[in-house]
């Protein structure tokens, strides 16, 4: 079980990183931040990814979660998946498989196939 969990965590991270468009440098970070602060869900998701990886800004998992959550609450399926991945791995939040399943379910409803797969996996594990 531990091996499977580690494997799924690695897959989640790899897949989650593909859910956002990367900024090239600090100026792109600033532009993305400005859009995110104005409520642009895609920019919020991208900003979360930038914080998660340290691209254009110092890596900060808690900030990544903050921005993923804002985009996810607006209904952006990619952000819902990314937030589910954070709860699955416990990076930036306390690990919570129930919340992970909830966000993966929303991502699945929004058309993110990886969210469907992980929702079913967590459902089979009775979360």
How would you name each of these model-derived features?
Residues 9-18:
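Bacterial N-terminal signal peptides
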Residues 37, 51-59, 73, 91-95, ...:
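Short coil/turn and helix-start
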Residues 26-29, 33, 41, 45-49, ...:
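Alpha-helical tetratricopeptide repeat
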Residues 1-9:
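Bacterial N-terminal signal peptides that target proteins for export
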Residues 46-53, 82-89, 118-125:
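Hydrophobic face of amphipathic alpha-helices that form TPR/SEL1-like repeat modules
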